[in-house]
């Protein structure tokens, strides 16, 4: 697999993970700028872009996350282009989340207290020509510096890259998930239970335009769309379902 691991000099968590990967002999492409403000012109062609990153939240809850970058609305204040999402590899995202959870569950890391979850599509970059993912340590400056957190991410990345490179994983149906909160608890649970390979995720509060709906179904391979039935507004469900049925896109409620 032709992949590119990417760090930012402006991101302490990114630098933390980078050091651990380099200790195992992995090359990490380093940016002078923030990762979310990068563009395809900053990188050579690759079949997968993986950004090593910090995660910040007001709760400061220790969290390890995975998500694909993209702007679901015209707001591009955090990088990328308005109403544009990156390509997504649901197998990579799901295996990476599962491997993070595997290492995080080991007895030696229990006292760290990290939660593991997906996040929905958000922020840049958005113009890359291949699947992209952010893997993040959160949610405060204290966690960004924790070596064991970087070691969890590093081991999970190595296992995931090897599994995909050698085809050493179980085939599952690939899905797109609509609805729920920012940390997508329902779809995180489905991924960790190994029920599906989970790709694009969008939150309840996003009002998805036809432009975004078209990108969701063309920039990721999938078997069907899943709708968090209690995690979307009724009006939005109606609009999305009409779109999927118009184009004969299979969907299911969960």
Curated annotation (Swiss-Prot):
Molecular function in Gene Ontology: D-aminoacyl-tRNA deacylase activity; zinc ion binding
InterPro entries documented for this protein: Deacylase_DtdA_archaea, DtdA
E.C. designation(s): 3.1.1.96
Cofactor: Zn(2+)
SUPFAM superfamilies: AF0625-like (SSF142535)
Family: Belongs to the DtdA deacylase family.
Name by which UniProt lists this protein: D-aminoacyl-tRNA deacylase
């Amino acid at each position: 697999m032709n992949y590119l691991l990417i760090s930012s000099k402006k991101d302490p968590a990114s630098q933390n993970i980078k050091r651990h990967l380099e200790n195992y002999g992995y090359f990490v492409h380093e940016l002078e700028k923030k990762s979310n403000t990068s563009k395809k012109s900053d990188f050579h062609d690759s079949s997968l872009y993986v950004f090593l990153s910090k995660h910040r939240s007001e709760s400061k809850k220790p969290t390890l996350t995975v998500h694909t970058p993209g702007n679901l609305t015209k707001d591009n204040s955090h990088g990328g282009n308005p109403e544009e999402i990156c390509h997504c590899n649901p197998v990579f995202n799901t295996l990476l989340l599962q491997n993070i959870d595997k290492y995080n569950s080991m007895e030696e890391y229990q006292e760290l207290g990290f939660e593991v979850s997906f996040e929905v599509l958000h922020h840049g970059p958005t113009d890359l020509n291949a699947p992209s993912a952010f893997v993040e340590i959160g949610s405060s400056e204290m966690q960004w510096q924790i070596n064991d957190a970087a070691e969890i991410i590093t081991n999970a990345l190595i296992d995931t890259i090897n599994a995909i490179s050698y085809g050493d994983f179980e085939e599952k149906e690939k899905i797109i998930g609509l609805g729920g909160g920012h940390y997508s608890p329902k779809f995180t649970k489905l991924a960790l239970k190994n029920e599906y390979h989970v790709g694009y995720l969008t939150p309840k509060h996003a009002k998805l335009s036809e432009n975004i709906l078209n990108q969701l179904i063309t920039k990721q391979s999938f078997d069907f769309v899943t709708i968090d039935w209690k995690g979307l507004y009724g009006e939005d469900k109606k609009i999305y379902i009409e779109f999927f049925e118009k184009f004969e896109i299979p969907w299911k409620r969960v």
